[in-house]
Amino acid sequence: MKKSILFICVDQWRWDCFSFMKHKNALSPNLDKLAEESTTFTSHFAGIVPCGPARTTMLTGLYPFIHRSVTNGAPLDKRFTNIAKEARKIGYDPKLYGYTDTSWDPRYLDPEDEKNFTYESPMEGFDSVCHLPEGNPV
């Protein structure tokens, strides 16, 4: 049986603002429990800002000057792979809860495809399970 993989990427949370990271005022009991059974990364950096290009860098493993998706909404060249596409090749079914702030390569889409008009589509390879569009209150 394959191991399950839960990859959590959050937007604008400081790494040190959790009680499991020894912050003196932060209380994060549910995340603390998850962290006890997880791998946490304490020595990393964002390759670029803003968030969409940073996620693209993280999910493709490519430097921004290679993937060239350097602003929110910039399409990712379809020739590049990502963690979801690679996971599918070995039998996983990647699900996305949230958003990636990437847009699909328009050269491979029908001109009327709705993916041409938004950057809120999930990155190719992911199935979107739960998506909260920007600007909509919870």
Features from the language model and the residues they span:
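Formylglycine-dependent sulfatase
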Residues: 1-138
